[in-house]
Regions:
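Short alpha-helix plus adjacent loop in nuclease-associated cores
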Residues: 1-34, 84, 88-93, 201-212, ...
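Glycine-rich, often acidic, oxyanion-interacting loops/wings at catalytic, nucleic-acid
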Residues: 45-156, 285, 290-291
């Protein structure tokens, strides 16, 4: 069938199709998927980490734009080297010279100053949101009765080594704070980390992960998986990773780290919902006594 085929699309056609589906559902066929709508409070709570991530992406774009404008003239200002500090950037910009020793064009300096003003504004907004997030988690750790379920679970996750405030808050606001999972398969599927088999007759192959779930959680879990291997080397999941890769190359490691991300997500779900500490995991030094309280 041609992919460019033009299909009829009218309200009448849609209503007839919907009525047939409803009739099949009434007869007991499984033709609809249940959509779990988050409560209004959970929707609002997700805005903070999402906005924080969006601002960080915007900051990166502005940084790259400033560096590109200056690099074209032979000027290198690296934010990782401390050049993007508010106290020194404008001073270094005024003293910068082109590759041939001549002053920077006035129009270029003006545009860079405009970009710098945007950078400072975004940086201030990031600090404000990060402080709000830290205050919310601090209140949850102190047992504030007004703390939301997502905040309390995020505070619990941060007790584990390798799990920071940002990652814990995203996990709980996107998943653990309001969603209900019946089994580990649902947990892996919601992040799109489960496999996609393709079989026919006696033949079959694995097509990789489905990538059909929450992209934010999927990306975060891969990052957390690498951190988990670093800060939790004696955990069962980390040992499994080392046993699997052996002398594997980068491709084998990439495939194995996705499996670690899936396993870790399930373990964190068991931890926040059932109090089961991941096998071999350790707590941060200031929370070493939490293992007995959670178990």
């Amino acid at each position: 069938m041609s992919r460019r085929k033009r299909n009829v699309k009218t309200d009448t056609v849609d209503v007839r199709k919907l009525s047939r589906l409803l009739a099949r559902e009434h007869e007991g066929e499984d033709v609809f998927r249940v959509v779990r709508v988050p409560p209004e409070e959970a929707e609002v709570e997700r805005l903070l980490p999402r906005q924080l991530k969006a601002l960080k992406k915007q900051r990166t774009r502005i940084t790259n734009r400033i560096q590109a404008r200056l690099f074209a003239e032979g000027v290198v200002l690296d934010p990782r080297g401390g050049s993007f500090r508010a106290q020194t950037f404008l001073k270094e910009l005024s003293q910068a010279l082109r590759w041939d020793g001549s002053p920077l064009p006035a129009g270029l300096v003006y545009m860079v100053r405009q970009d710098w003003a945007q950078y400072c504004l975004v940086e201030e907004q990031i600090r404000d949101l990060a402080q709000r997030q830290r205050r919310a988690l601090r209140r949850a750790r102190e047992g504030d009765p007004e703390a939301t379920p997502a905040q309390r679970k995020a505070a619990l996750l941060t007790e584990l080594r390798g799990i920071g405030d940002v990652g814990a808050y995203v996990l709980t606001t996107e998943l653990f704070g309001w969603r209900v999972f019946n089994n580990r398969k649902e947990v892996g599927a919601i992040a799109g980390l489960t496999g996609t088999p393709s079989t026919s007759g006696n033949g079959g192959r694995e097509q990789g992960i489905s990538k059909a779930g929450n992209a934010r959680v999927r990306t975060l879990m891969v990052e957390l998986a690498w951190l988990w291997l670093r800060y939790q080397p004696e955990s069962r999941t980390s040992k499994w990773f080392r046993d699997q890769i052996g002398k594997a190359g980068s491709r084998g490691k990439r495939r194995a780290i996705v499996a670690v991300a899936r396993k870790l997500l399930v373990e964190l779900w068991h931890f926040v919902e059932h109090g089961v500490v991941p096998d071999g995991a350790t707590f941060k030094p200031e929370n070493a006594g939490l293992a007995q309280r959670v178990a």
